[in-house]
Design a protein with these regions (language model features):
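Conserved active-site neighborhood of enzyme catalytic/cofactor-binding cores
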Residues: 65, 74-110, 268, 369-379, ...
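Flexible, glycine/threonine-enriched loop-and-boundary segments that flank and lead into catalytic domains
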Residues: 52-54, 306-337, 394-430, 545, ...
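Conserved oxyanion/phosphate-binding beta-strand-loop segments in alpha/beta enzyme cores
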Residues: 2-10, 15-70, 100-109, 133-139, ...
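N-terminal catalytic cores of NTP/NDP-binding nucleotidyl/phosphoryl-transfer enzymes
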Residues: 52-134, 158-169, 338-341, 345, ...
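Residue patterns forming the tRNA-binding/recognition surfaces of aminoacyl-tRNA synthetases
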Residues: 2-27, 32-33, 37-41, 126-336, ...
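Nucleotide/phosphate-binding sheet-loop regions of phosphoryl- and nucleotidyl-transfer enzymes
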Residues: 275-277, 284-288, 292, 347-382, ...
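Catalytic alpha/beta core of large soluble enzyme barrels
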Residues: 92-93, 105, 358, 362-471, ...
Length: 643
């Protein structure tokens, strides 16, 4: 007699246990019996409108109400599930069963977010190939989920490493890459702004309907530009584009990390390695183009107001102006664009600051200008030495450390000067790590009379402070309470010290004195646009999404490069581009403290896969997409019409 049979027999007369005691073994028998019945009858099967996927009664969808229940996919980066997984799955299972009992056609399926750093790191730690460990972990997780009795339609289970899923991930990337955001496009709802094919943008350039950036005054037509020039221009419009971006470089892991993968201490979440800020060539998604739409669409969702407010603040829409300053260098005048929410304070700008990653720092002079205070130089003999050392120091800090309000304000003079387009004043140009390259333009105009951070910086380096706003008369406050002690920080007040008889850009008179702040902003924005040195614009705290990694375990980009380095999109017929099985899949790692090291993608060592001969060109891209891209279309791939 088996142990199970023994536990289901009546207890003997001398036993203290009740007959047919409900214990773990009996529970397992009952669960196993009903799970087999559910499997045999297809109790949890969802029916498609047509095709082979029918419900347990052999029916296609027949007009019954449809209900879609979705769970967050587990990462198969460990041998099995942990206790946190069923916490969410049980809740969605209760909801699914409720709607199924109401007679609805319920689609409730499970999948596995199988690419990415966690799965690859697990494989490295266990000394196996990621595909081997991932498939083994998926099999065990599937067994565990089934054993829990959750009402999934297992016929529809998939993993993000499946070729069919990879194909659609790459197809989605192709559509994003081949699109641009047309702010003037009219949507069916009457609103403006929509993604349009890049071919339409090219047609606008060819017809002259849209000016070609950088060629507004030289008369060049689109056909006059070579292919590389055309692609550089289109790259500035594509929704998926190549950028030189400040990134979290982790030499110890040999890869770039997302902000979420970096701890508050500036270490990698995996392995606890130091993380440095580096500027590298990366793939980015132009999500900032959708900033305003994201805010507007929050009104249409049934979320708590507190959560929606957090989202609005995270997107961070602000209205201001972009302003162009001229910077004189040995290589000629260079443009420095800044974004400010307070263009009315342009008269109070006494210095400017750029990020350590800013391109202008490639043009610093060989020697210090005359009469530069010693504390501006940071102890260095030349601007070149000073900038190089400061850049290295900035790389060792996280973005969070750099913008910490309580931290010490560091910086040094670059040897360059920027010209104020209104007053013509020569503003010393500093570099400071509290200015981030991927926020705004990586350059700021400093107004110490109206900003605490600028005031602290000005005091430290002995820079002048000009107040351009005074309190309203009815406020009971007085500017004398601030002068020489602190900035007057207020969006409202009366503008002062803001008049010039002849502007630097136009030679006309301009005065903002006596105006309220909002009126002064409107007036100066109009002047900036008329002078061709700026315009009113909108900026976002939200940043474009960097989504490439120098790892092996992920989908390759469907991009090849020509001999001239020009990227070409592979046709849909070539998809999916699958990962080759390689013996050496680990990225090259470096000394964890080697901030100057450069990433080496594992696939770059696979010459047979990297080099291809096509009419498009040769040299397949060796970066791959991060896990977040293949996770972000899970909903669509599981919808009934897509199954």
């Amino acid at each position: 007699m088996s142990d199970n049979e023994k536990t289901t027999q009546p207890a003997s007369t001398d036993s203290t246990e009740p007959a047919y005691r409900y214990n773990a073994a009996l529970a397992q028998d009952i669960e196993g019996k009903w799970q087999k019945i559910w499997d045999d009858k297809g109790t949890f099967w969802a029916a498609n409108v047509n095709g082979d996927l029918k419900d347990g009664k052999g029916r296609n969808a027949d007009g019954r109400p449809a209900y879609f229940a979705m769970d967050m996919f587990p990462y198969p980066s460990g041998k099995g599930l942990h206790v946190g997984h069923p916490l969410g799955y049980l809740a969605s299972d209760v909801v699914s069963r409720y709607h199924r009992m109401k007679g609805e056609n319920v689609l409730h399926a499970m999948g596995y977010d199988a690419f990415g750093l966690p799965a690859e790191q697990y494989a490295v730690q266990t000394g196996q190939h990621p595909r081997v460990t991932t498939l083994a972990n998926i099999a065990n997780m599937s067994r565990q989920l089934h054993r829990m009795g959750l009402s999934f339609d297992d016929r529809r289970s998939f993993a993000t490493i499946d070729p069919g899923y990879v194909r659609w991930t790459q197809w989605i990337f192709s559509r994003i890459y081949d699109s641009w955001y047309d702010e003037d496009a009219v949507n069916p709802s009457g609103s403006k702004g929509s993604a349009r094919p890049v071919s339409e943008l090219v047609a606008k350039f060819e017809s002259g309907e849209k000016a070609i950036p950088g060629h507004e005054s030289d008369g060049k037509a689109w056909a006059d530009l070579d292919q590389a020039e055309q692609q550089d221009i289109l790259n500035d419009f594509r929704l998926a584009y190549i950028s030189k971006s400040p990134v979290n470089w982790c030499p110890g892991l040999g890869t770039v990390l997302a902000n979420e993968e970096v701890t508050a201490e500036g270490k990698s979440e995996r392995g606890n390695f130091p993380v440095f800020q580096r500027e590298l060539r990366q793939w980015s998604m132009r999500i900032t183009k959708y900033g305003h739409r994201l805010i507007e669409d929050l009104d249409g969702i049934d979320w708590p107001e507190k959560v929606k407010l957090m989202q609005r603040n995270w997107i961070g829409e602000s209205h201001g102006a972009s302003v162009h300053f001229t910077v004189a260098t040995a290589d000629g005048s260079k443009d420095m664009e800044i974004y400010t929410t307070r263009p009315d304070t342009l008269f109070g700008t006494t210095f400017a600051v750029v990020s350590p990653e800013h391109h202008l720092l490639e043009n610093v002079p060989a020697e210090w200008p005359a009469d530069v205070p010693e504390d501006w130089k940071g102890g260095y003999a030349t601007p070149v030495e000073a900038v190089k050392a400061y850049r290295l120091a900035a790389e060792a800090k996280t973005a969070k450390d750099r913008v910490d309000e309580g931290g010490e304000k560091t910086g040094l003079f670059t040897g360059l000067y920027a010209t104020n387009p209104i007053t013509g004043a020569k503003l010393p140009l500093f570099t400071a790590d509290y200015v981030l390259m991927d926020y705004g333009t990586g350059a700021i105009m400093a107004v110490p009379g109206g900003d605490q951070r600028d005031y602290d910086f000005a005091v430290k380096f002995g820079l002048p402070v000009i107040y351009t706003v005074k309190p309203l008369p009815e406020s009971g406050d007085d500017l004398a309470n601030y002068e020489g002690k602190a900035p007057f920080v207020s969006h409202d007040g009366i503008v002062i010290n803001s008049s010039v008889e002849a502007t630097a850009a136009k030679g006309d008179a301009l005065s903002l004195n006596g105006l309220r702040v909002d009126d002064a902003i409107a007036k100066v924005n109009a002047w900036l646009e008329s002078a061709g040195v700026g315009k009113g614009t909108v900026s976002y705290r939200l940043r474009d999404w960097l989504f490439s990694r120098q790892r092996y375990w992920g989908e390759p980009f469907p991009i090849v490069y020509g001999e001239d380095g020009t990227p070409h999109l592979l046709p849909d017929s070539a998809l999916p581009i699958s990962l080759p099985d390689v013996p050496d899949y680990e990225p090259r790692t470096f000394d964890p403290m080697d901030a100057e090291s450069n990433p080496e993608a594992p696939l770059s060592r696979n010459e047979d896969w990297v080099k291809v001969e096509l009419d498009l060109g040769d040299g397949k891209k060796t970066d791959r997409k991060s896990t977040r891209l293949n996770s972000s279309h899970i909903t669509r791939s599981r919808m009934p019409s897509s199954a």
